[in-house]
């Protein structure tokens, strides 16, 4: 039987009677459970990543789908891919119910698939549903249709055996237990979702060759700090002085291109 663990009563009571220190320590105690829950989900995360990579090598994309906090986290992770890895913003796309962070659009079971078809989704793409409850109609409808069309589906949820997981080729079930404030899934569930999204996109981008050693050699040079960081990467890699390294970087636009051009 499907049980919404994420909606179960908090392990703590009379929160309004607690001191600030007690509240903070309680929240921190609960947050420490999140990393362990994510650790237990690593085999499923690995399974999803290893299926995403070959699809992306063929031109596939990742679509995150969610509502509320879950949707916003998908949009956030997607927005970090271009500056961090120098990839186009069309490669990882976050879709949120309503098109913007609108709270009530999540009950439309058809709209999610409509948004995917508007973006010409293909069987090279991957759809990842994000919902702590695992019951969001907007997400479930999109995943169902995607799967019917032979598209890889994954999900991230805080409840076992959810309706959303039933539509996933790979279900990442991150069981963090009841929230500190009962039902407030922006807390532990949201923290765990962000950790897993980081793991998915970072490991995918590494597998796609967007990291060298441990460095973001394809990052966008969008501010002075990143230009300085990129320059120091080139100094370390090629042994040039700072001025020459910076000039080389600015000429070619990325650390990788600058290093490759210098070595030709």
Regions found by a protein language model. Give the residues of each.
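Cofactor-/ligand-binding subdomain signature composed of acidic, glycine-rich
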Residues: 1-37
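A short, well-structured juxtamembrane/interface segment
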Residues: 40-55
């Amino acid at each position: 039987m499907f049980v919404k663990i994420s909606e179960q009563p908090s392990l703590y009571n009379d929160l309004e009677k607690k001191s600030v220190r007690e509240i903070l320590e309680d929240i921190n105690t609960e947050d420490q459970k999140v990393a362990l829950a994510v650790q237990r989900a690593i085999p499923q995360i690995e399974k999803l990543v290893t299926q995403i990579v070959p699809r992306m090598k063929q031109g596939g994309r990742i679509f995150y789908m969610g509502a509320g906090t879950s949707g916003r986290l998908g949009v956030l992770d997607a927005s970090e891919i271009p500056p961090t890895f120098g990839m186009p913003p069309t490669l990882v796309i976050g879709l949120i119910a309503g098109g913007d962070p609108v709270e009530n659009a999540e009950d439309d079971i058809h709209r999610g698939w409509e948004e995917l078809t508007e973006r010409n989704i293909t069987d090279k793409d991957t759809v990842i549903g994000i919902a702590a409850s695992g019951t969001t109609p907007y997400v479930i409808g999109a995943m169902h249709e995607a799967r019917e069309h032979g598209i890889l589906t994954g999900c991230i949820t805080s409840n076992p055996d959810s309706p959303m997981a039933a539509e996933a080729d790979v279900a990442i079930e991150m069981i963090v237990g009841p929230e500190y404030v009962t039902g407030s899934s922006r807390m532990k569930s949201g923290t765990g979702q962000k950790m897993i999204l980081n793991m998915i996109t970072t490991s995918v981008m590494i597998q796609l060759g967007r990291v060298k050693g441990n460095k973001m050699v394809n990052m966008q040079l969008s501010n002075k700090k990143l230009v300085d960081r990129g320059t120091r990467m080139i100094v370390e890699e090629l042994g040039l002085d700072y001025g020459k390294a910076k000039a080389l970087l600015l000429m070619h636009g990325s650390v990788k291109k600058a290093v490759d051009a210098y070595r030709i």
